[in-house]
Amino acid sequence: MKKTEFYTVRDKTTQFTTYDDMAEIVAYLESKGNFHDGTVEAIGHDEESTTIGFKHYSDPEYTIHRLIFTGNVELRLNVDLLVRSIYEIQCETGERVNVFFNGVGIEITASHVILRVQELITQEKSPPS
């Protein structure tokens, strides 16, 4: 599968702000300091979306990956499993949904549903032994 987006962030000066609806997830991620064997690099917000950026230790380029949510989104993360596939998610008016990244569940609870899911990075599956 082709990688639809792959990028490395070297600029550490990018300014991010948060808003009330994301306060809980911001505090949670900051308290962990470790996001699925990676590090949270940024939690950003603009008029249209919220971005959680993190680096994964398995990536030799230490590429930053983004989860992008549009709208009022609350996340509950299953941190017991490792994220190997990262998706970009666009949410618009709707209901509660569950999204799985290679078996890692992220529950999105909001007045939004997924409008578009675009695979950014795929994990090659090992053949059965």
Regions found by a protein language model. Give the residues of each.
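Surface-exposed, interaction-prone regions used to assemble/regulate multi-protein complexes
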Residues: 1-129
